[in-house]
């Protein structure tokens, strides 16, 4: 599941039918469970990506410092050993393999931020429904 799919799903689920407020209030626990399940899944995926990042970071560190197995250099030659910390950091920052995993972690962070806001909105939905009911009562002349 990607961010676009979650956003489209929320766009459909976020609509409150003003004519069926009682049904909408009953859907709140289901929506909470649905989006919290997605939140937990994405959190686990992010943790796996962090684990992969640490593994790739060690592999790339060994690669740039000349400590990787010979087979690695046969597949991907690197003629020098980087000994300077600053140069090593520049190589690590520019490393494509490391950047891909880091980008995945950032993507998961964005998804989690969106889901946190969705869950917060779902939690506040009872107040929105209550306000809508009070507005209907006010319009009907009941106080």
Task: Place the predicted regions along the sequence by residue.
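Charge-rich amphipathic alpha-helical interaction elements
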Residues: 1-143
């Amino acid at each position: 599941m990607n961010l676009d799919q979650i956003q489209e799903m929320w766009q459909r689920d976020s609509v409150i039918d003003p004519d069926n407020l009682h049904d909408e209030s009953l859907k709140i626990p289901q929506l909470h469970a649905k989006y919290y399940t997605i939140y937990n899944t994405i959190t686990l995926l992010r943790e796996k990506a962090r684990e992969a990042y640490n593994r790739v970071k060690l592999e790339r560190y060994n690669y740039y410092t000349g400590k990787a197995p010979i087979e690695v250099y046969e597949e991907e030659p690197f003629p020098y050993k980087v000994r300077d910390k600053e140069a090593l950091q520049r190589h690590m920052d520019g490393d494509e393999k490391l950047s891909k995993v880091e980008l995945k972690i950032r993507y998961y962070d964005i998804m989690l931020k969106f889901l946190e806001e969705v869950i917060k909105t779902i939690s506040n939905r009872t107040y929105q429904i209550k306000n809508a009911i009070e507005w209907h009562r006010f319009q009907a002349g009941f106080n």
